[in-house]
Amino acid sequence: MKKMKALQIIAAAMAVTVAATSAPVNVFAYGETSASSTLFTDTQNISDYTTWKDTVWNKKDDQGNLTGEGESYDSSRIILTPGKTAKDLGFAWYSLEKGEPAVKIGKKEDLSDAQEFKGTATEINRSNQKNTYKASNKVTVEGLFEENTTYYYSYTDDVKNPAWSEVQSYTTKKTTNFQTILVGDPQIGASGSQGQGTADDINIAVDTFNWNKTLEQAKITAPNASFILSAGDQIDYAGTDSSDGKNVRESEYAGFTYPALLRMLPLATTIGNHESKGTDYKYHYNNPNSEDGLGSTNSGSDYYFSYGNVLFISLNSNNRNTVEHRELLKKAVESNPDAKWKVVMFHHDIYGSGQPHSDTDGANLRALFAPLMDEFGIDMCLTGHDHSYARSYLMADGTAIQYDDSVAINPEGTLYIAAGSASGSKFYKLATTKQYYIAERSNTQIPTFSTIDFSDESIVIKTYDYN
């Protein structure tokens, strides 16, 4: 007998309040700009932020010299990415010189039992305010990782002249009844005008602070999360790879990669419209099953991976070539015939409800991507772009399938989620008229994140406001 499957959504938004003692800490505040559809953060007036800015971002030594994050703008930090399966893991980081990169991994914190894995280095020329990076380093480790196990790792830019990094930890989780974290549009640098490229750059500093706070709360809410899903626009600067453009983009990546959680939990991203024209995205991440280059723009391509009984597929929706996207989807689905659930992530919210995009480019892209979701029986599609939360009804061939009590049993069609803003760098107002396909929508002008629980029988999605 075929098992029944349920798709369950718990609440459109559940408020999370963080307290230092017994009193709530209000981290975010917003003010409307001259753009009638857009709201930007006013975090620079919040005391928690000013303390962090003075003691971390603009930290000074005894001689008054800047030594903090805003001085280094370190976009070389290592990022973990999911491997092809739960037994695999990807690593990516920048270095000042090109060498032969490697990662060593063991179960003992002193790495006395470590195995060494060599990778590849690609020559680049990426500068921010402080550094010029000459290599993008990637290492892929396959078949090593067991469930519910803590591993320790260190990495070097060059095994021939090794200077190993400090030891970091990575704890695997179970692959049945597992949980992920979903975020949308961190868009570091978007809280005002384009980045100014100094230690006092309000936009990058503010968005880094808020992005880190959201991830910290997400980890508290979902301590057993296996990895993070980010639905695009990790950074803000949308220009091409001009010298100035690369400078600003790498400074924004310094903010995006700042949270320590990204050294401990794999991150699966998709390419947003703000990343699509530059090449830095493909240098910062080591995405699995991307070697065919299907769905490519300058920034990178489609890719996929499996975790437990779920197939995850990331499509580059900046590329409108449905032939290539179909080829990737076909390869992914045929390679994972036992997947109980199929989840696609791309940036543009084809069933969103934000004022700027849902009835313009979102509607146009719907004609391209929605038929692919129907064709391959995709259960859930995760998107961003409109900086407001939206959940569709189950959609099949453009028709909204109603369901009661936020639970669908043996559902037909695809559920579409627009993730909102994880950093609160900016928000878009909701469309004046609620579209026919929208089951729930929200713009509380507070950053959001979601947890997604997967089992053989169900997917449960909970979305939180973080204040």
Language-model region placement:
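Bacterial Sec-dependent N-terminal signal peptides
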Residues: 1-10
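Acidic, histidine-bearing metal-coordination/catalytic regions of metal-dependent phosphoesterases
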Residues: 11, 22-199, 445, 455-467
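Extended active-site neighborhood of metal-dependent phosphoesterases/phosphodiesterases
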Residues: 147-174, 195, 199-201, 242-338, ...
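Mobile, glycine- and charge-enriched loop segments
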Residues: 175-198, 325-363, 421-423
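Conserved, compact domain cores that house catalytic/ligand-binding motifs in diverse enzymes
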Residues: 178-270, 275
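Active-site neighborhood of phospho(di)ester-bond hydrolases with catalytic His/Asp-centered motifs
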Residues: 182-184, 227-233, 267-273, 316, ...
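Solvent-exposed loop/turn segments at secondary-structure junctions
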Residues: 186-190, 234-238, 273-277, 312, ...
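Active-site-proximal segments of metal-dependent phosphoesterases and phosphodiesterases across multiple
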Residues: 198-203, 210, 238-249, 339-381
